[in-house]
Amino acid sequence: MKKLIIRKTEEIENWRKDIDSEINFIPTMGNLHDGHIKLISTAKNDNSNINLVSIFINPLQFDNKLDLENYPKTIDNDINISFSNGADAIFIPSNEDIYPPNNNISFLKAPIELSSALCGLNRIGHFDGVCTVVYRLLNLIKPKNLYLGEKDWQQLLILKNLVLRKKLNIAIKSIPTQRDFDGIPLSSRNVHLSKNERKLISFFSRELLEAKKNFQKEKKINLKEIIKKLSEKKISIEYLEHLHPYTLQKAKIEDNISLLAGAIRCGETRLIDHVFLMKRRPIIAIDGPAGSGKSTVTKLIAKKLKLLYLDTGAMYRALSWLIIKENIDFKKENKLQNILKDISIVFKSNTSSHQDVYVNNYCVTEEIRSQKISSIVSKISSIKEVREFLVEEQRKIGESGGLVAEGRDIGTTVFPHAELKIFLTASIDERAKRRKSDKNSKDLQEIDLHKLKELIKQRDSEDSNRKISPLIKANDAIEIITDGYSINEVVDKIIDLYNDKIPKESEIK
């Protein structure tokens, strides 16, 4: 495709009609740096869409005329950087194109619950200007994907809200904050810093990063101590806050993930920085009935996100297998207590990059998927002592997070504070077809489809009506009905939800 520079709104509209491709859109205000390069190259590598970079210095985002006049303008270099790193087209409109004097442009208001904190405290109207220009650009360009940096976290939240509020069919893709050699977040305004000012900014960023490191050990933050250290360096602090990362309200002690964000001034330059604090790595809880695709989907998600795969259903099946093998009357509490005391259930990766299940050092991966086990596992899993024992084992595995677990009570009982909860389901017909074609359930392949539907209905009834941890959708779970969707489509949907819930830069290293 020929590289193209577009300067008029009429041209962008005509170009949009002529192209036969979706658009990845990377909005910028010019003076491009490595952070912008990361956005452009990420868009290029993500898919085969056309990549459009816009360069527009939005006057509505500046606190005063002098700030606008002093903003670096490096258009020729910006064009070279954009095209060199994957842009197919560049949109460079004028003020008159974006804000035509005789046209009724929608001047938007940012949501007050997100714009009144942090930068919004002193930059009145700034985020209104952000919403106005981005909404104008999105309406002109109509992209499939919008690429934004997490460096401007508050702005990212507000633009996500804008896309949701205006019901725009646009996916927002974010990239982590990109830092320079001395730890400072890359910013177009860094060129204004003197050597001494840069040292102060670097000290500020290092303090935030050190606070993140300490939080991983101590699970608490001391704002007063950080402010004291900054004040001793004569750093002018505009704000330093510990907040919930999505509501921007004061962080609560029970929050697993929180935001430590600050803004300082050095000379005439104002800079922002933040870090995410996590008590443990994220957890994804996937619940749903038999045959809904939980196992297949969960395994793929674990692989793609590099998370531990915890198959809690396999743990109940493994215990059921041992009960049958040892011919134990599980209705007798003393017999059950003995087996719970001595059982060892271990997951091991095999040479096929799959997970094998071992009971007391014996591999039972295939045996626990038999219909014989399926017919008894719901009864055994409804026993109070069994559930208490295995739930405790599962929680031990999840103490440090970093896992995706599937079962029937993950989001309600095992990990009620999971960052993302999914309730995966499908129609009885669809689930019966899947179970019958499941190569790991050989005995199910020989059962009549009608009979299999009845077995699934029976299992659903047992799971949903048991007194302890019944199969129910958690209040904050997102339901996904998988009829008509491929496995990969479901996986991609859940990963998108995960990326929307978990900042990319928040992962504990």
Swiss-Prot record:
It comes from Prochlorococcus marinus (strain AS9601). This is Bifunctional pantoate ligase/cytidylate kinase. The keyword Kinase applies. Residues 276-509 are annotated as: Cytidylate kinase. It comes from the Bacteria. The keyword Phosphoprotein does not apply. InterPro entries: Cytidylate_kin, Cytidylate_kinase_dom, P-loop_NTPase, Pantoate_ligase, Pantoate_ligase/cytidylate_kin, Pantoate_ligase_C, Rossmann-like_a/b/a_fold. Residues 1-275 are annotated as: Pantoate--beta-alanine ligase. One of its GO terms (biological process) is pantothenate biosynthetic process. Gene3D superfamilies: HUPs (3.40.50.620), P-loop containing nucleotide triphosphate hydrolases (3.40.50.300), Pantoate-beta-alanine ligase, C-terminal domain (3.30.1300.10). Beta-alanine binds at residue 61. SUPFAM superfamilies: Nucleotidylyl transferase, P-loop containing nucleoside triphosphate hydrolases. The active site is at 36 (proton donor). Its main location: cytoplasm.
